[in-house]
């Protein structure tokens, strides 16, 4: 059995929205979401730090699991719940500093080889993607599909896992049925005609996560 070396997270993180603003963090926390990721791109450093500080404060207020994408130094400085890194960021990041600060670590993967790389670091959870075609981010890899996702989930057994990539409200039940512990969503909420309704429906499918 694989065991994380970073601080653990619940096996089921539940619904896991990935958003790019403090405004979305606050909305979703107010709507009952308890696992989130702040992913900021193309902003000035001082703006990024201000948003990271505000998001972490909100996460604490709601007793939520807030992960900061990429900006691991700021996450350590301001004591975030956790950090999420892509494969391309692992070599350039001081993982021992993240571990020493007591932060959880999530790592993106896209195939078996990248899962091996992630497992070598023993993160808190492993993200599996992208499951379906996605417009949110340019992806060099092909979509995995449900069958491949289920195989990865089985391989990782009791390791906390997160499915990501093109997961819509309609697709969410089939993704959860693979046994994955969490579903990360972006446009399924942020581009929904009624984001509150979409969030409530996705929470009903994926839950808020284990304590």
UniProtKB/Swiss-Prot annotation:
Residues the record lists as binding 4-amino-2-methyl-5-(diphosphooxymethyl)pyrimidine: 37-41, 69, 108, 137
One Pfam entry name: TMP-TENI
Keywords: Magnesium, Metal-binding, Thiamine biosynthesis, Transferase
Pathway(s) served: Cofactor biosynthesis; thiamine diphosphate biosynthesis; thiamine phosphate from 4-amino-2-methyl-5-diphosphomethylpyrimidine and 4-methyl-5-(2-phosphoethyl)-thiazole: step 1/1
CDD domains: TMP_TenI
Record-listed 2-[(2R,5Z)-2-carboxy-4-methylthiazol-5(2H)-ylidene]ethyl phosphate binding positions: 134-136, 166, 186-187
Cited InterPro entries: Aldolase_TIM, ThiamineP_synth_sf, ThiamineP_synth_TenI, TMP_synthase
Alphabetical list of Gene3D superfamilies matching this protein: Aldolase class I (3.20.20.70)
Residues holding Mg(2+): 70, 89
EC number: 2.5.1.3
One biological process term in Gene Ontology: thiamine diphosphate biosynthetic process
An annotated GO cellular component: cytoplasm
Record-level Gene Ontology MF annotations: magnesium ion binding; thiamine-phosphate diphosphorylase activity
Cofactors (names): Mg(2+)
Catalysed reactions, semicolon-separated: 2-[(2R,5Z)-2-carboxy-4-methylthiazol-5(2H)-ylidene]ethyl phosphate + 4-amino-2-methyl-5-(diphosphooxymethyl)pyrimidine + 2 H(+) = thiamine phosphate + CO2 + diphosphate; 2-(2-carboxy-4-methylthiazol-5-yl)ethyl phosphate + 4-amino-2-methyl-5-(diphosphooxymethyl)pyrimidine + 2 H(+) = thiamine phosphate + CO2 + diphosphate; 4-methyl-5-(2-phosphooxyethyl)-thiazole + 4-amino-2-methyl-5-(diphosphooxymethyl)pyrimidine + H(+) = thiamine phosphate + diphosphate
Cofactor: how and how many bound: Binds 1 Mg(2+) ion per subunit.
Enzyme class: transferase
Lineage: superkingdom: Bacteria
Protein family according to the UniProt entry: Belongs to the thiamine-phosphate synthase family.
Entry function: Condenses 4-methyl-5-(beta-hydroxyethyl)thiazole monophosphate (THZ-P) and 2-methyl-4-amino-5-hydroxymethyl pyrimidine pyrophosphate (HMP-PP) to form thiamine monophosphate (TMP).
Name of this protein: Thiamine-phosphate synthase
Gene name in the database record: thiE
